[in-house]
UniProtKB/Swiss-Prot annotation:
Known function: Regulatory subunit of calcineurin, a calcium-dependent, calmodulin stimulated protein phosphatase. Confers calcium sensitivity.
Protein localization: Cytoplasm, Cytosol; Cell membrane; Cell membrane, Sarcolemma
Key words of the record: Calcium, Cell membrane, Cytoplasm, Lipoprotein, Membrane, Metal-binding, Myristate, Phosphoprotein, Repeat
Keyword Amino-acid biosynthesis: no
Biological processes per GO annotation: branching involved in blood vessel morphogenesis; calcineurin-NFAT signaling cascade; epithelial to mesenchymal transition; heart development; lung epithelial cell differentiation; myelination in peripheral nervous system; negative regulation of calcium ion import across plasma membrane; positive regulation of calcineurin-NFAT signaling cascade
Lineage, uppermost ranks: Eukaryota, Metazoa, Chordata, Craniata, Vertebrata
N-terminal signal peptide: none
Organism: Homo sapiens (Human)
Protein family per UniProt: Belongs to the calcineurin regulatory subunit family.
Protein name: Calcineurin subunit B type 1
Length: 170
């Protein structure tokens, strides 16, 4: 990882060269088979993600080329969204993408149900969960199209300061 490798990463992230070096060491420790990319199992060895019911969604978002693994560039770009230097909109967009499973720019009733189901497991009956989903869509959907746009999502969660909790220490 010479200067030529880290320079572009500085351009596409909120990290400086030293932070990228530290993240490179962390990435290499996680990359148990030295393949140059992280599998789901390797990613799961991060203590911060082991108890997270949405870990698969996080991996799906980090994995921008869709090959099922996270390479170093995807890792840097993904973690950068959680940098203290990351802006509110970027963090909210990441949170939105957790729910927007089909990447169409909207959160549908079905997508909201699936993600909430990942979070609550069997603690709620599906009918109870569906009622919560329906009510959430009704409250958030200002244009009446039956789904939640990024703007509608921000109107609901933007004032909750969730972006301040979406930070990792590098």
């Amino acid at each position: 990882m010479g200067n030529e490798a880290s320079y572009p990463l500085e351009m596409c992230s909120h990290f400086d060269a030293d932070e990228i070096k530290r993240l490179g060491k962390r990435f290499k420790k996680l990359d148990l088979d030295n393949s140059g990319s992280l599998s789901v199992e390797e990613f799961m060895s991060l203590p911060e993600l082991q108890q997270n019911p949405l870990v698969q969604r996080v991996i799906d978002i980090f994995d921008t080329d869709g090959n099922g693994e996270v390479d170093f560039k995807e890792f840097i770009e993904g973690v950068s969204q959680f940098s203290v230097k990351g802006d509110k909109e970027q963090k909210l967009r990441f949170a939105f993408r957790i729910y927007d499973m089909d990447k169409d720019g909207y959160i549908s009733n079905g997508e909201l149900f699936q993600v909430l189901k990942m979070m609550v497991g069997n603690n709620l009956k599906d009918t109870q969960l569906q009622q919560i989903v329906d009510k959430t869509i009704i409250n958030a959907d200002k244009d009446g199209d039956g789904r939640i746009s990024f703007e509608e999502f921000c109107a609901v969660v933007g004032g909750l300061d969730i972006h301040k909790k979406m930070v990792v220490d590098v």
